[in-house]
Amino acid sequence: MRGLDYKWIEALDAVVAQGGFERAAEELYISQSAVSQRIKQLERFLAQSVLIREQPPKPTPVGKKLLGLYRRVRILEHELIPELMNDDTAKPIQLALATNADSLATWLLPALKEVMTQRQVELNLAIYGESRSIEKLKSGEVAGAISLESQPIAGCKADYLGRMDYVCVASPDFYQRYFAAGVNYQTLRKAPAVSYDQYDDLHNRFLHDHFNISRDSIINHNVGSSEAFVRLAVSGIAYCLIPKLQIEQELASGVLMDITPGFLLSYRIYWHHWQLESGVLKEISQAIVQYAQAHLPL
C-alpha cells in the first residue's frame, strides 16, 4: 500500500500485544502520546478505525488484516536479513501456532521436536478449540493453526493431517456406581462428565447424536487440561471423551474401559498455514504434516 508507514502498524501491534498504550510505549521506547499519534495517523490514512478503544484494546476487522500483514512481514524479515548479512548471532524467531489441547497432549510435540531442537525458534503454542483456532490465523495472531475446517482461508493452505478418534471412557469403579443398569438416557443424565471449556462441544455432540441428550440435562465439569481428563477418569471422578491415542495403555490394562463400545467420535483435522512459506515456517509445516499423517489414522 503506497504511503503506508509500517511504524504505524508497529504501534498498533504493540498496543494489541501489550494490552494498552502505556505498555506499548515501553515496548517501543517512545512516549505514550507518540504511540497514540501513530495510531491516529494510520486511521487518518485509511479513513477508518483500526482499534476498538476498550480495556484491553482490540483491533477492528481492518486492524486485524493489517496485523496479519505486518506479522507475516516481520517473520519473513527475521529470516531473510540474517541470511543476507551472514549473521549467525540473530535472536530466535518467535512464532505463534494455534492448536487444540488434544493434539498438544498427544502427537504435536513429538512432531515439532526436531525443529525445536535444531533451529533458533521460540514457539508460542496457544490452545484454542478446534473450531476457533482458524480465527486466530485470520487475524494474523498465529502463523499456523490446527482446525476442523477443511477449506483454507485466502492466502493459506489446508493440509489434511488425519483423524482424531475419541473414546467415551470411565474407570470400572465409576461404571459400577453409575452405569450398573447400562449406559442410557437415564443413567447418563446422573453421571458427572467433563468438557474442556464452554466452547468445547465434543462431549455434548456425542451425547446428542447417540443418546438424544442436551447439554443442560447433564452434570458437566469444565477442566482446561487434556491430561487432567485422564486423571479424572482414572480416579473415578467422571467419565470423559478422550483421544484413543492418549489412553491406549489405560484401555489395554483395564484401568479405563470403553463404556459405549461401537460408538466412536471421529474428527478430521487440518493444518492451516500460509501459502508462501520459507525457512523455519516451512520446516514446521512439513514436520507437522509428515508426522501427523504417519501417526494418526487416515
Swiss-Prot record:
Sample GO molecular function, one term: DNA-binding transcription factor activity
Key words of the record: DNA-binding, Transcription, Transcription regulation
Source superkingdom: Bacteria
Residue ranges occupied by any HTH lysR-type domain in the UniProt entry: 4-60
InterPro entries in the record: ArgP, ArgP_gammaproteobact, LTTR, LysR_subst-bd, Tscrpt_reg_HTH_LysR, WH-like_DNA-bd_sf, WH_DNA-bd_sf
The UniProt record lists the keyword Transcription: yes
DNA-binding span(s): 21-40
Record-stated family: Belongs to the LysR transcriptional regulatory family.
Stated role: Controls the transcription of genes involved in arginine and lysine metabolism.
HAMAP family recorded: HTH_type_ArgP (MF_00513)
Assembly information from the UniProt record: Homodimer.
Descriptive protein name: HTH-type transcriptional regulator ArgP
Species the sequence originates in: Vibrio vulnificus (strain YJ016)
Gene name of the record: argP
